[in-house]
Amino acid sequence: VGKRFGLRASITLVASLLGGAAAASPAADQVRATLEAKYPGSPLGTVTESPVPGIFEVVWGKNLVYVEQTGRYFLFGNLYDMVGRADLTSPRRAELTKVAMDTLPMQDAFARVIGKGERKVALFTDPDCPYCQRLEQAFAQVGNVTIYTFLFPLDSLHPNANLVARKIWCAGESERGAAYDAYMARGAQPDNAGQCDNPVARNVELGRRLNIQGTPYLIGMDGSTKPGALAPADLDAWLNASNRVKAAR
């Protein structure tokens, strides 16, 4: 969606209505037909009635938006039920961003094990991302995790990251984890030209398909996703929840 839509600001819509499961309806079908006609080729998913009369929930790619019946005005933000004291949007958005771990091309990642390695997580990381470096410190503190590491350089932010990512991969299968750790901790680059066969371009394309907007980006065993660097306590809790296990170093 872009500037052509009448209302672009990120809006929180506060509802005093009781929330309920969204349902398909003739009205929702009509809104869907209107959106298809107005915005052909857009990644339009399901359209359902929201708890607010005249407002419809629309899955747009991996985003969740609200629209009125003419398809002109869009609301971006969270819908709250103030009677039930519930955020109606966040759980739906979390479902949309889920990624099944077994669908990831693990041959394009390398595994790093900290402690027992019982908890599993996939990580999309840019070696020049300061938040990724901060997350690595948190991983070291919480322990008991196996990290399937996908090198995902953000060229627009870190022009040197693509070369560094390729050098890390080209360090060789047994040395990739150590090469990554050394660069993240000390900025020590592997001693190679980064010219081997590598998955960096594939990882960038994979991230685009998964709508990954930045790094770090975590994918849990239960499919849940978590963008951004987490404090150690928050990371530990999220790893436990996404793996459904108790912490043990």
Predicted regions and their residues:
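Short strand-coil-strand connectors
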Residues: 61, 221-222
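Acidic, Ser/Thr-rich peripheral helices and adjacent loops at domain boundaries
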Residues: 164-178
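Short, exposed beta-strand-loop hairpins at the edges of beta-sheets
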Residues: 227-228
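Extracytoplasmic thiol/disulfide redox context detector
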Residues: 2-5, 13-14, 18-166, 185, ...
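A recognition module on extended beta-rich or small alphabeta surfaces enriched in W/G with H and D/E
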Residues: 178-181, 248
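Catalytic His-Asp charge-relay segment
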Residues: 217-218
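Short secondary-structure capping/turn micro-motifs that flank functional sites
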Residues: 156, 223-224
